Structure formats: structure tokens, C-alpha cells
Amino acid sequence: MYNLLKGTWALFFGVGMMMLANGLQGSLIGIRASLEGYSASAAGIILTGYYAGFLLGALYIPQRIKNVGHVRTFAALASIASISILIHSLHISFLGWFIMRFISGMCFVGLYTVAESWVNDLSDNEHRGQALSVYMIVSMAGSAFGQLFLYIADHETATLFMIVSVLISISLVPILIVVSKQPDFSVAKFFTVKELYKASPLGVVTSIMTGLAHGTLWGIGSIYGLKNGLSIEQVSIFMFTFVIGGAINQYLVGYLSDKYDRRTIIVIVAFLASLFSVLAVL
């Protein structure tokens, strides 16, 4: 496990910077849309653009990785994502923001694919759960601490958009200059949803349900906070606590998944998540 982390520190650092940026931009755009006078429905549609791009990118980007490799794909997508967030501050319109969110979604699903396939390739089955849990800890911690950047600048200026762009650009540096073994993507096989469901029904259903819940909170969590009287600083703390809780829990879940039946762990974690969600609204 130590050797794995030693060989992938550049990747994990890049992921951390990338997720700082993504965590900040998700809440920032929701807040800024509200400040610009968009209704909750309109803001929700704008933010949905990210997930539409995410879905399309999941079908298109793997072929790009196969053709040009992990490092070049990561560099290209990070550069496009960095540009797209700056355009948000240059041109404020419903359609313009939707398109930029769509492009950002395509870029980030590609960045996730590069990072996760890289980690997966470098870990054996005995330690895969722990390796992926470390990846998720870095990812979610980055997203969580990204929320706190809302404290440092005026939300009605371009400063926070620039900070997001800078963080994305920084994520490139260690990956481009540190030589590391790259996965062989030449044997990658595309799986249909039907094939995935046949291989792991519980995994597919859990992924869909988790995506629905996760996307809803990420998409309108900041707007919900503002509409219910929270200040922008309180919204950042609200979103931070949601994400950091997941980060803290990741390694334990990954460790248990390496020791016990992963289906059992999924059921237990899903039950606990549902229970605490119900308690939160009582």
C-alpha cells in the first residue's frame, strides 16, 4: 500500500487540487446564479448542464484516453475546464452558463476517468478497496475544503472564478513533470448498462441511486441554504460538513470492503445513509 501511494503521489496531488476547484465552483455558481436574480428552477437547470456533460463525456472520453494516453488527456481536459470557468465571469447569461457547465461536466468526467483507472490499474485486488478509498478521501476532502474558499473573496466579482481556474491549472503541474507508470488502456472494453447490471446488479442500482442523491445535493444544496436564510458563509459550512463526513468515512468503508463481502458493505452503508438522511429532516 505504501509503495502504491509513493508511486501515485503526483496523481493524488493533482486530484486534490482539481477537487478543490470543483467543490468551489459547484457552490459558487449556485450562489452567483441566485445573486444574479435567477429563480431556483433556472439555477437548477444551469447546474444540470454539468451532469448532462458528465453523462455524454462518460461515453466519449474513454476513447480519447485510449488514443492519446492518460497524461495528455488529463492536460487537455484540465485546460478546457480552466477556460470554461473563466468564461462564466466574462459572460453572464442563462444559455452561456448552461453551455459552460456542460463543457465542464465533460471535462471533469474525463479527469475522473483518468484518475480512477490509473489508481485501479496500479492496485491489486487485495488492496483495491483501500487504494480507491484513499483516492476518494483526497477527492472528497478537496471538495469539502473547496467550499471554504467562499470566505475569501467577494462573491459578486470574478475573483473566485479566477481562483477556480488557478487551482485547476495547478493540478496539471505534478502530473506533467513527474514520471510515473501509466495504465495500458489499449485493452479497455466498453460495457453497456445491461452488461454491468448482469455483472453486478446491486452495484449498478446503488450507483444510480447514489448519483441521484449526490447530484441533487451538489446541484441545489447552496441554493437551498440561501433560500432558507443562511448567509453565504453558513452555506459554505453546510456544504463542507456534508462532504467532509463522507471523506472521513471512506477509508473505513474501503478497508471493510477488502475484508468482507462488498455487497454486504454496500447494503449496510446505504441503510445508514438513509437513516441519517431521515433523521436530518425530522
Identify what each model region corresponds to:
Residues 2-51, 203-207, 214-224, 228, ...:
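Helix-loop boundary and gating motifs at the non-cytosolic
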Residues 51-59, 143-144, 243-251:
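Residue-level signature of mid-helix packing/kink "hotspots" within the transmembrane helices
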Residues 57-69, 154, 249-261:
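Helix-to-loop junctions at the C-terminal end of transmembrane segments
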Residues 69, 90-92, 261, 282:
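Helix-breaking motifs and short loop linkers at transmembrane-helix boundaries and internal kinks
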Residues 72-87, 165, 264-279:
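Structural signature of the two symmetry-related core transmembrane helices
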Residues 95-103, 276:
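Paired small-residue
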Residues 102-137:
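Cytoplasmic helix-loop-helix junction between adjacent transmembrane helices
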Residues 150-151, 165-185:
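C-terminal membrane-cytosol helix-exit motif in multi-pass small-molecule transporters
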